[in-house]
Amino acid sequence: MSATKLTRREQRAQAQHFIDTLEGTAFPNSKRIYITGTQPGVRVPMREIQLSPTLIGGSKEQPQYEENEAIPVYDASGPYGDPQIAINVQQGLAKLRQPWIDARGDTEELTVRSSDYTKARLADDGLDELRFSGVLTPKRAKAGRRVTQLHYARRGIITPEMEFIAIRENMGRERIRSEVLRHQHPGMSFGARLPENITAEFVRDEVAAGRAIIPANINHPESEPMIIGRNFLVKVNANIGNSAVTSSIEEEVEKLVWSTRWGADTVMDLSTGRYIHETREWILRNSPVPIGTVPIYQALEKVNGIAEDLTWEAFRDTLLEQAEQGVDYFTIHAGVLLRYVPMTAKRLTGIVSRGGSIMAKWCLSHHQENFLYQHFREICEICAAYDVSLSLGDGLRPGSVQDANDEAQFAELHTLGELTKIAWEYDVQVMIEGPGHVPMQMIRRNMTEELEQCHEAPFYTLGPLTTDIAPGYDHFTSGIGAAMIGWFGCAMLCYVTPKEHLGLPNKEDVKQGLITYKIAAHAADLAKGHPGAQIRDNAMSKARFEFRWEDQFNLALDPFTARAYHDETLPQESGKVAHFCSMCGPKFCSMKISQEVRDYAAAQTIEVGMADMSENFRARGGEIYLRKEEA
């Protein structure tokens, strides 16, 4: 926690400085590598952690070393993780996917924006200073065409996005030769299919079956392809966004870059304050990861925050506005039906979802069915024209462990399953959002119900938080539940920061939430038995046993904190080569003792072997040379 609280002016100035001086940066002793595919432009980034050699013998004067292989790891930081790429936030990122989109020949540029709100914003000269300078000319599907990755997959097409993902999901593990590093315990996958090698054909088949989605709006060509599905690596989402109380465009762009640096696979912009449209444009043009939104938040701003005044027309205009900016997935609370709202009356904490409470209030005030449910097919038509994936929101998720797994929660889940099938009719990709607050013993039912009710569409959960007693530490309480539900089959975990229930997260909160959730996701991958998931753990354990401190720092999810904690007690350079740490000291280090035991056992084996040879020599008469038939 920062010792001095910055003023709003200082926070904005700090964020502006971050943006102005931004450069591609690698983690300590890491380098950016690229693995190329067979299709044009498929060049997949990874981070390779360089390791120091292991001392295996020799003398002090002439030590003998054995090289350790570099460890490739998944990297979602895009150009921000490559020191060779010049970064200019004012210009945005390179349009990686634009040639692929254009080559398919099924899109057309729009001469006029479809959203009335967008037209009004562009015509307002007063916004020129806030506006992103290089506004993209949006595209949409040509008449009668669909441009979704699901549409292509169902027709047997392997897109460049699918090949990119296959290479990325394999994490470069084919480069690893060491049997020690490749060793992996069998997992318990709970029905997930985890092939030893992920191919582009496998990616296509999973997308075609609806078990995975590739969020990739044709108007967000800057994004690097990624996949969300039970049979792939567990992903992590980070939430950012301004509010009416705090945060600016500069700070949100800073949080975006910061999020990708610490491993966010997708980012949701949940802005509810001023300049939502302009903030989102800056975020999209500078984001290498898919961006999600909750359109009802902005639609509510357009009617001055009065839920009863919401209309389908205002919401539709918001969908078009955001789709043409490049939003990759929409959270839509279409499962909050009028008849389900009374089911929440006996809850301890009622309806805690912002989107859910907005729609519940609208339904009750008009005594009509949810207009998102009523117009769901029209929503799907819009999504199919831009390849916006749907994240079907859990507006009735439990907000306390007491309310977990109740009638309202599962009634909505059943409706989300119905909506999933409708979306698939339009070739629209779908994932399902889940809770929430759920005690550990009740978590698995959430996964089994989702798979059954929603036809194996990917599950995306907020935690769940396993206890309600730890404000300020809810990244821990939820990380426990996230690891469990990820193991059971959840495809993406929405991070929770230390500020959950308390306030809007800052940069450090974002980092803490992401590190916690990267741990949870990785633990789930290990438990499922995802091929190659244990390589980094094995490399860390080997470095730890061999007292290669620099390698231990660099293999960590957060090398800076690992080094800082070590140096608090052993700051000298000699501490980086010491065969102990401050926890046990030199005389009680279990690993040093283990090495001594191993060396002693090896020496004993040699001594016994020499004794056996001596006995054999004497038994043969003590002759130096044996006759040929005796040898």
UniProtKB/Swiss-Prot annotation:
It catalyses: 5-amino-1-(5-phospho-beta-D-ribosyl)imidazole + S-adenosyl-L-methionine = 4-amino-2-methyl-5-(phosphooxymethyl)pyrimidine + CO + 5'-deoxyadenosine + formate + L-methionine + 3 H(+). Its cofactor is [4Fe-4S] cluster. One of its GO terms (cellular component) is cytosol. Substrate binds at N239, M268, Y297, H333, S353, R354, G355, D394, G395, L396, R397, E433, Y460. Its EC number is 4.1.99.17. It holds the Pfam family ThiC-associated. It comes from the Bacteria. One of its GO terms (molecular function) is carbon-carbon lyase activity. Zn(2+) binds at H437, H501. [4Fe-4S] cluster binds at C581, C584, C589. GO terms for biological process: thiamine biosynthetic process; thiamine diphosphate biosynthetic process. Pathway: Cofactor biosynthesis; thiamine diphosphate biosynthesis. The keyword Coiled coil does not apply. Keywords: 4Fe-4S, Iron, Iron-sulfur, Lyase, Metal-binding, S-adenosyl-L-methionine, Thiamine biosynthesis, Zinc. Binds 1 [4Fe-4S] cluster per subunit. The cluster is coordinated with 3 cysteines and an exchangeable S-adenosyl-L-methionine. Belongs to the ThiC family. Homodimer. Catalyzes the synthesis of the hydroxymethylpyrimidine phosphate (HMP-P) moiety of thiamine from aminoimidazole ribotide (AIR) in a radical S-adenosyl-L-methionine (SAM)-dependent reaction. This is Phosphomethylpyrimidine synthase. It comes from Escherichia coli (strain SMS-3-5 / SECEC). The gene is thiC.
